C-alpha cells in the first residue's frame, strides 16, 4: 500500500511537470516569423525580400536604434551562394515606453525589407538566412529564426509578397 501511494505521488508529479513544460512551450509562441520573397530588380541586381514578424497582443519588437533599452534585429547569411551583400531595412518605428524607458519599435505586425544583392542573376541563390531579434512584453525574449533560401532570380514574378514588401519599403525613412 505504501509503494502504491508513492507511485501515485510520482505519477502526479510527472504529469504536473509535463503540463508545465507544455504551457511554458506555449508561452514561447508570442510571435510568428516568415520569409517573404518578392521580385528581382534586374537594373540594380537585387532580390527584394522581407522578414514578416507577427506579434501577439502587447508584444513589441525593436527598431535598428531601439532607444535606451533593447537590441535591434539583425540578419546573418550562413553558407550562402551567389550573394554579394544583404541590406536589412527598417520602416519608420513607433515610440514606446518600456518601464518608463523610451524605446522605438513595432507592434502587431512588421515587415523588415531585405535587399539581397546577387552576383549572377542567371544562377541560383541558396543558403541559410538567420534572423535575430528581441521581443518584449513584461520581459524581453531573444528570438532566432532560420530560413532556407532557394531562389532563381531571373524567374521572379510580381506576387502578393512583392506588394507587401514594397509597402514596407515605402515606410523606410529616405536616409537609407
Locations of regions flagged by a protein language model:
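Bacterial N-terminal signal peptides
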Residues: 6-16
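N-terminal secretory signal peptides that target proteins for export/translocation
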Residues: 1-4
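Extracellular/lumen-exposed scaffold segments
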Residues: 20-176
Amino acid at each position: 500500500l505504501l509503494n502504491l501511494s508513492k507511485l501515485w505521488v510520482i505519477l502526479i508529479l510527472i504529469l504536473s511537470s509535463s503540463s508545465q513544460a507544455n504551457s511554458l512551450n506555449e508561452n514561447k509562441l508570442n510571435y510568428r516569423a516568415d520569409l517573404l520573397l518578392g521580385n528581382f530588380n534586374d537594373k540594380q541586381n537585387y532580390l527584394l525580400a522581407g522578414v514578416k514578424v507577427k506579434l501577439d497582443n502587447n508584444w513589441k519588437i525593436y527598431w535598428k536604434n531601439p532607444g535606451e533599452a533593447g537590441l535591434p534585429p539583425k540578419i546573418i547569411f550562413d553558407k550562402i551562394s551567389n550573394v554579394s551583400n544583404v541590406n536589412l531595412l527598417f520602416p519608420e518605428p513607433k515610440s514606446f515606453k518600456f518601464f518608463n524607458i523610451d524605446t522605438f519599435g513595432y507592434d502587431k505586425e512588421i515587415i523588415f525589407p531585405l535587399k539581397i544583392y546577387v552576383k549572377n542573376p542567371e544562377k541560383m541563390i541558396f543558403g541559410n538566412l538567420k534572423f535575430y531579434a528581441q521581443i518584449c512584453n513584461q520581459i524581453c525574449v531573444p528570438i532566432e529564426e532560420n530560413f532556407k533560401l532557394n531562389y532563381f532570380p531571373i524567374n521572379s514574378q510580381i506576387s502578393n509578397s512583392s506588394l507587401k514588401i514594397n509597402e514596407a519599403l515605402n515606410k523606410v525613412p529616405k536616409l537609407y
